[in-house]
Curated annotation (Swiss-Prot):
UniProt xrefs under SUPFAM superfamilies: P-loop containing nucleoside triphosphate hydrolases
GO term, biological process aspect, one: DNA restriction-modification system
Protein name in the entry: Uncharacterized protein Rv2917
Membrane-spanning residues: none
Family the entry assigns: To M.leprae ML1624.
Pfam families in the record: ResIII
Region: Disordered, residue numbers: 430-452, 518-538
Ranges annotated as biased composition (Polar residues): 523-534
Upper taxonomic lineage: Bacteria, Bacillati, Actinomycetota, Actinomycetes, Mycobacteriales
Biased composition, class Basic and acidic residues, residue ranges: 430-439
GO molecular function, one term: ATP binding
One GO CC term on file: cytosol
């Protein structure tokens, strides 16, 4: 039993005098919960539990970073409330069918039995269960049924990833109807925000200094705190850029570089071109990711990797690439395929290397051995990104790190740099992104076969890949280097077991070595080193663009200014068209301008 505070003791003594729980026909009878099932709690879980038992709120919102143990916290609350008859049954609402099974397994460790097979069509359940597992969609399809169950007996309702309650107006209305009379409601989320203004049910909003309504959590445990406590892994982002080429519906051909200032439409199309499984970018990035995974498995033999794809077609294509490149067939998980849940469980409990998924493994699914990720989707909302990265941060032993390979796209780089920022859901944001912004829509909210209208008539012509930068702890390290180079290998070969301080020191050391080598190569050179390396105009343009991008990275590290500022300063000094339309002479002039900028700042 717990013995934390006087408030907790008063709670227990009062509940011990409660009457035995009655039988209620087909709804079952309350099963006793043994006090022997009390797995040890982490620090944040203990503090939140003391707060909850001391205040006894009807509604409680716990915001904790993915991988920190929200499920265990909620199950401990449920066990306490059942043991002292504050409630007589538990209903847990989750986003997916697989999570129903995952929660039921976790509940057993707390002495709780939850029915993961409960169905609207057959609302009877065995009296041996303490409660049921349902999905948000299941509640929305028959809210009256769940309201009757909730009103029949004192009920604790646990909402896993409560932000899903605002996914559709009908969902929010159904959840309020079904659980408005619940005795207790416990809401959990690792991402207490949405990309729209849909209010999250049973969450309080308070005006900030500007009068804007912001969601209010009762207890918050962020990524930075969890990292300091060793609860989650440090995350290293390896951002890959490259020159992308495509043709539009009018037959016009375009070329642009990922990571450079582009219009939203150009960025979206360059991004999509890079993710094309038939191109050169994805095979190069997958090769790098697999090399990183093999490095980690030298220290952590069961470490696994996951590619997050945009849709079923590309997921299967990436799986074929993996099979060809690694001689090992990956596990493929598509949320609308039979047996997906079983395949996730098999992968989680096994030692195979790669998993390819669309959406089903992007949120809530617990696969602690995932250590390497390839973010191969064009979803760019903070919500989807945070939930996807959350699949890789669960720590099992000291020193484990996660490595995520991402396209060098401004939206993603900003999200990667701000991983430790704690966000709240804001209603009525004055400058909310336009619904027509090609980068604002989240493909994860579409069906897995849907294609956007902007894709019709679009043809990807190819994209090369190079390591643009490494992001860790909000800082950028390294300069652009081709895939397969020794410099890329230095970053891919970082030891698999390092704490945050060791990782930071090592990245600084690698960057200093890289910059020193680059400076030595450029010293004494009267012309760009690559000016005669390629006989063709195409080859010379490619090499000059690469050198220009390297100089931008060097300027970024020397000045501390963002890449966008450096590009703006370069344009101010020498003007000219976008780099895809620039001549060799114009690119050389830009290289000279950046060298001048670097000399001014050194």
């Amino acid at each position: 039993m717990l013995h934390f505070t006087a408030a907790t003791s008063r709670f227990r003594l009062g509940r011990e005098r409660a009457n035995s729980v009655r039988s209620d026909g087909g709804w079952g009878v309350l099963q006793p919960v043994s006090a022997t099932f009390n797995p040890p709690l982490r620090g944040w879980q203990r503090r939140a539990l003391v707060q909850y038992l001391g205040t006894q709120p009807r509604d409680f919102l716990a915001v904790a970073t993915p991988g920190s143990g929200k499920t265990s916290f909620a199950l401990r609350i449920a066990a306490e409330l059942l043991r002292y008859h504050t409630v007589e049954q538990v209903t847990v609402v989750v986003p997916t069918e697989h999570l129903k099974v995952q929660w039921a397994h976790a509940a057993a460790a707390h002495g709780l039995s939850l029915d993961p097979k409960f169905a609207n069509s057959n609302p009877q359940t065995s009296p041996e269960y303490h409660g049921v597992m349902v999905t948000y969609a299941q509640v929305a399809s028959h809210p009256t049924l769940h309201r009757v169950r909730t009103e029949a007996r004192k009920t604790l309702v646990v909402f896993d990833e409560i932000h899903h309650g605002g996914d559709a107006k009908t969902w929010g209305d159904a959840i309020r109807e079904a659980f408005g009379d619940a005795t207790r409601r416990l809401a959990l989320t690792g991402t207490p925000f949405r990309s729209d203004d849909s209010p999250i049910p049973f969450v309080s909003y308070q005006p900030d200094a500007d009068g804007v309504l912001r969601s209010q959590a009762d207890h918050t445990y962020g990524y930075a705190e969890a990292l300091a406590d060793g609860v989650v892994r440090p995350v290293v982002f390896l951002a890959y850029s490259g020159q992308a080429r495509w043709r539009d519906s009018a037959g016009e051909e375009y070329e642009a570089r990922l990571g450079e200032p582009l219009s939203a439409e150009q960025t979206a199309r360059a991004w999509r071109t890079a993710l094309d499984p038939e191109g050169e970018w994805m095979p190069a990035v997958i090769t790098a990711a697999d090399r990183r995974l093999r490095q980690l498995r030298a220290h952590v033999p069961d470490a696994g990797g996951m590619i997050i794809a945009s849709d079923r077609t590309t997921a299967r294509a990436y799986a074929r690439l993996l099979t060809t490149m690694t001689a090992e067939e990956p596990t493929v998980v598509l949320s609308d395929d039979p047996g997906s849940s079983a395949r996730i469980t098999e992968f989680a409990q096994g030692t195979s290397r790669w998993l390819v998924a669309v959406r089903m493994v992007s949120e809530g699914v617990d696969v602690p051995r995932l250590s390497v990720g390839v973010y191969a989707t064009n979803a760019s909302t903070p919500l989807f990104f945070a939930q996807a990265i959350g699949r890789f941060v669960r720590s099992r032993r000291p020193g484990e790190t996660a490595s995520i390979f991402v396209p060098s796209v401004p939206n993603l780089l900003q999200l990667a740099s701000a991983l430790e920022v704690q966000r709240n859901h804001v209603l009525g944001r004055p400058h909310r992104e336009s619904a027509h912004d090609p980068l604002d829509g989240d493909p994860a909210t579409r069906t897995q076969t849907e294609r956007g209208g902007a894709e019709r008539g679009f043809t990807a012509l190819g994209a090369d890949a190079e390591l643009d930068q490494v992001i860790f702890d909000g800082s950028s390290f390294g300069t652009a280097t081709p895939t397969g180079s020794d410099e890329e290998a230095d970053y891919l070969g970082i030891p698999g077991l390092l704490d945050a301080e060791q990782m930071r020191a090592l990245l600084h050391r690698r960057q200093d070595e890289q910059l020193r080598k680059r400076a030595q190569l450029q010293k004494g050179a009267t012309q760009p080193a690559t000016s005669g390396a390629s006989a063709s105009v195409h080859g010379q343009l490619r090499d000059l663009r690469r050198e220009l991008h390297t100089l931008v990275s060097i300027a970024h590290h020397r000045t501390g200014k963002p890449h966008g500022w450096i590009h703006d300063e370069r344009r101010r000094r020498c003007g000219g068209p976008p780099i895809a339309a620039a001549t060799r002479a114009q690119i050389k002039a830009r290289i000279d301008a950046l060298r001048q900028l670097n000399s001014e700042r050194s």
